[in-house]
Amino acid sequence: MSTPAFTVVIPARYGASRLPGKPLADLLGEPVVQHVYRRAVESGAARVVVATDDARIESACRDFGAEVLLTAPDHPTGTDRIAEVVDRLALVDEAIVVNLQGDEPLMPPELVALVAERLDTDPDAAIATLATPVTAADELFEPSVVKVVRDHRDHALYFSRAPVPWDRDRFDGIDDGAVAAGGWLRHLGLYAYRAAFLRRFPGLEPAPPERLESLEQLRALWHGFAIQVAATDQRPGPGVDTPADLEAVARRLQSTR
């Protein structure tokens, strides 16, 4: 199956609490955002745009040849920032836009292409995302690991930090083997959107479950938009949230050179 034409937008904020300026943090001689940009280009995207709120990031991106837009500084979410980009680029409503976070230098390009492809082949979905099997009990019960439940069409029914679906008979003392065989899915935070949805998103009221779980994707479900969830066994490497993450990612990249 051929990959559709799609645009990748990389939101890159300067003001991260645990690692301020992380898009510009040095990673093997290049800023983190340059590694992310390279992954996006390798995905086969027709266009790659960095969206930032900071002139320093804008300047660095221009230095390595990226297309970059300086966006409004007060967007409440990264999705709102991407919605601004969609309007400024005058993308048609049917255009597919992939949101690749600016702190994911280990994201496999194949997954970027996959999420775009799955949205293209599901005309009923406004959004596509990815999930991978949960393989261990501590992963299943970890609130920072978001779980997703799908219907028979691979559309999301719900996302939660809780271990859903709940197995009322087996969760007491469940081991890794039972978890691996249980069919639970871990959400991967990579999204493809139709431009028409992104234009509507800023006007959607935040949903009660979204506030409770602190999961933005629940807003789309609450307002009736279908989310296609493609399963994959391929997991991206860790993102960069802390100085320790930066060191770990550097070691991993160094080992592949």
From Swiss-Prot:
Pathway the protein takes part in: Nucleotide-sugar biosynthesis; CMP-3-deoxy-D-manno-octulosonate biosynthesis; CMP-3-deoxy-D-manno-octulosonate from 3-deoxy-D-manno-octulosonate and CTP: step 1/1; Bacterial outer membrane biogenesis; lipopolysaccharide biosynthesis
Catalytic reaction(s) noted: 3-deoxy-alpha-D-manno-oct-2-ulosonate + CTP = CMP-3-deoxy-beta-D-manno-octulosonate + diphosphate
Any one biological process term the GO annotation gives: CMP-keto-3-deoxy-D-manno-octulosonic acid biosynthetic process
Similarity remark: Belongs to the KdsB family.
Tagged with keyword Secreted: no
Entry-linked InterPro entries: Cytidylyl_trans, KdsB, Nucleotide-diphossugar_trans
UniProt xrefs under NCBIfam families: kdsB, PRK05450.1-3, PRK05450.1-5, PRK13368.1
Function description: Activates KDO (a required 8-carbon sugar) for incorporation into bacterial lipopolysaccharide in Gram-negative bacteria.
EC number: 2.7.7.38
Alphabetical UniProt keywords: Cytoplasm, Lipopolysaccharide biosynthesis, Nucleotidyltransferase, Transferase
EC supergroup of this enzyme: transferase
Domain of life: Bacteria
Entry GO MF terms: 3-deoxy-manno-octulosonate cytidylyltransferase activity
UniProt name for this protein: 3-deoxy-manno-octulosonate cytidylyltransferase
One Pfam family per UniProt: CTP_transf_3
Keyword Transferase recorded: yes
Organism: Halorhodospira halophila (strain DSM 244 / SL1)
Cellular compartments per GO CC: cytosol
Subcellular location: Cytoplasm
Gene: kdsB
